[in-house]
């Protein structure tokens, strides 16, 4: 019986373990939390959640709802657990966190081919097939050892994300480009518009992190949010110098390096609550009908340069025994972490059986996420699933009425993927 190691019993690690245990591998699952908990951990069960509502919508018209459906078709343990522990009946999947974690822990423990090792995993053995599925608050000792095999330049420790918006929600009659260079668009604010925007920004509510002093930690490392910058009004004004002589300030939008349908609001990394981001940033002229596809966040995180380090099987290019899963590869969100664990396990199994490693089609939600991660540039920020990551269907621009067609296509593509990998 072939031995596989999985480092981390979070969402991605447990999803990977479940798949490989079913395949008959002997799985060594390393988890340190029973002997050393990080600041946001409280229980000894696997897959401890910080929030009960982070599985988000079950509506198939949403990208995350479709992603959960794709995972369900792939027999996801985590989705089974979430449904078991669900505490509501509407379109939001809210779970009892303790019951959710208990379900997964107890289910995995029924496998005789699982060995749970409750200790810190320090020395990465390159000769043993391994999935590294660590979370955003990993131990310094493990990160030190990880840097030895990937080079410390390829590991980021903080997440400072600017809001990413849908191109079609930008008013091109107000926002403009220079010399027809559509890589950048510009939004001018006169003094009256600026004052309204500025006052809304400084009075907006910020996210309350479960990690104590997280914002201070970020600022200590020279990562400042747009709301922190706004504490000094004149400095804020100087930061957004006008391009047009008639403007008081100018805000820049930058096209995404992979997806033409997305733009980021430059220098707007933020800890504002999501509803506040929509309210405040829609005050920018040209963004009145703003659709945010990925909200800005700022928090402690560990993630690697996926495009540079990993191949299409999420396998380390320099050592074929090492695979990665979870937030470490640059996915953002609970459900996204689940799918990364499953894909890593599928491809590790295929690698060990001398089969070609494959990903789902890029127009499935799972495939679109990997297509983005494996193509984006080295300065990317973690991405969560959204419909802008898939190719547009001819005649169907992204809208509330057209999303059902995108969902139907994605689910059909996952069914084709199941046949391709002979999933049982």
Curated annotation (Swiss-Prot):
One of the record's GO molecular function terms: flavin adenine dinucleotide binding
Cofactor(s) the protein needs: FAD
Compartments (UniProt record): Cytoplasm
Function: Catalyzes the folate-dependent formation of 5-methyl-uridine at position 54 (M-5-U54) in all tRNAs.
Annotated EC: 2.1.1.74
Residues binding FAD: 8-13
Reactions catalysed: uridine(54) in tRNA + (6R)-5,10-methylene-5,6,7,8-tetrahydrofolate + NADH + H(+) = 5-methyluridine(54) in tRNA + (6S)-5,6,7,8-tetrahydrofolate + NAD(+); uridine(54) in tRNA + (6R)-5,10-methylene-5,6,7,8-tetrahydrofolate + NADPH + H(+) = 5-methyluridine(54) in tRNA + (6S)-5,6,7,8-tetrahydrofolate + NADP(+)
Keyword NADP: yes
Identification of the protein by name: Methylenetetrahydrofolate--tRNA-(uracil-5-)-methyltransferase TrmFO 1
Gene that specifies this protein: trmFO1
One of the protein's GO biological processes: tRNA methylation
Native species: Mycoplasma mycoides subsp. mycoides SC (strain CCUG 32753 / NCTC 10114 / PG1)
One Pfam family linked to the record: GIDA
Classification via PANTHER family: GLUCOSE INHIBITED DIVISION PROTEIN A, METHYLENETETRAHYDROFOLATE--TRNA-(URACIL-5-)-METHYLTRANSFERASE TRMFO
GO cellular component: cytosol
Superkingdom of the organism of origin: Bacteria
């Amino acid at each position: 019986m072939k031995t596989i190691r999985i480092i981390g019993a979070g969402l991605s690690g447990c999803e990977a373990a479940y798949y490989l245990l079913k395949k008959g591998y002997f799985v060594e699952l390393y988890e340190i939390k029973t002997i050393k908990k990080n600041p946001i951990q409280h229980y000894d069960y696997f897959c401890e959640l910080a929030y009960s509502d982070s599985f988000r919508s079950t509506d198939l018209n949403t990208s995350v709802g479709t992603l959960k459906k794709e995972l369900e078709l792939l027999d996801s343990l985590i989705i089974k657990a979430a449904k078991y522990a669900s505490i509501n009946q509407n379109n939001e999947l809210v779970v009892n966190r303790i019951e959710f974690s208990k379900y997964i822990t107890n289910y995995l423990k029924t496998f005789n081919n699982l060995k749970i090792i409750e200790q810190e995993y320090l020395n990465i053995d390159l000769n043993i097939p391994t999935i590294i599925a660590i979370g955003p608050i990993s131990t310094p000792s493990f990160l030190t050892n990880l840097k030895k095999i990937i080079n410390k330049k390829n590991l980021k420790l903080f997440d400072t994300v600017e809001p990413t918006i849908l191109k079609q929600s930008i008013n091109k009659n107000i926002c403009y480009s220079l010399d027809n260079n559509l890589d950048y668009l510009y939004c001018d604010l006169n003094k009256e518009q600026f004052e309204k925007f500025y006052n809304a920004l400084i009075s907006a509510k910020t996210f309350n992190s479960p990690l104590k002093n997280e914002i201070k930690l970020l600022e200590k490392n020279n990562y400042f949010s747009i709301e922190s910058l706004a504490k000094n009004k004149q400095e804020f004004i100087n930061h957004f110098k006008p391009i047009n002589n008639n403007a008081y300030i100018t805000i820049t939008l930058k096209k995404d390096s992979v997806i033409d349908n997305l733009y980021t609001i430059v220098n707007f990394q933020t800890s504002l609550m999501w509803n506040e981001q929509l309210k405040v940033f829609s005050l920018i002229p040209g963004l009145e009908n703003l659709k945010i596809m990925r909200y800005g966040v700022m928090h402690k995180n560990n993630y690697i340069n996926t495009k540079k380090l990993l191949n299409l099987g999420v396998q380390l290019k320099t050592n074929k025994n090492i695979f990665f899963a979870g937030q470490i590869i640059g996915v953002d969100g609970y459900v996204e972490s689940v799918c990364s664990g499953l894909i890593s396990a599928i491809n590790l199994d295929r690698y060990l059986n001398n089969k070609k490693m494959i990903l789902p089609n890029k127009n499935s939600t799972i495939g679109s996420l990997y297509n983005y991660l494996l193509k984006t540039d080295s300065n990317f920020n973690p991405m969560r699933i959204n419909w802008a990551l898939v190719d547009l269907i001819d005649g169907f621009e992204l809208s509330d009425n057209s999303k059902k067609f995108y969902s139907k296509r994605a689910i059909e593509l996952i069914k084709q993927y199941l046949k391709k990998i002979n999933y049982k």
